[in-house]
């Protein structure tokens, strides 16, 4: 019985060894990859000087109101953790990062018309400018340094790419880029609007110009067929018209 147990233990150890070495640099296989998903903003704050950008507010005074603000995580923080061995100690093959491009500057309601909390694009899924990295995450050079660090550890980097839709049109962006006259200052647009009728500010958003205009996107209040998967919008988000074959004008703010 003792010999059988020893033999079983040896077989198990050999199997574990084979599994652990399954994804070397020469034999990498996505089917056996260990993928670690990182929401960059919520991982590690390595540089507090880049915590506030674009007129955003990060602290509204309570934990509930701050639930969807930017919390400070950035490329420097990820690089710091990588150098400490965080990912290698876990046996990670791939780090999957949320989208890194510039997000909408303002916020949208985090809970319907009640506006329980301001919801920013901290998660990377509310893109504004696909040609720039969001300053809250860091710089191009810092991003390259992070990727180089992970590559040196034999870790691949996978990026999110939300190409189906831009982020919501926000009041702060409307003011900063002169999309529309909403009757607010930039500071007022960034504050938590709850005592006013939030939706009234967007009553004319279909006429906003300089943003992603009608040739680019469809909006949910344009009465598209929401049962048609090619025309439906998700959670009221603007939807890029991927089916169009005509050339479109690059938005003025890009």
Each model region followed by its residue ranges:
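Residues in and immediately flanking transmembrane alpha helices
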Residues: 15-16, 173
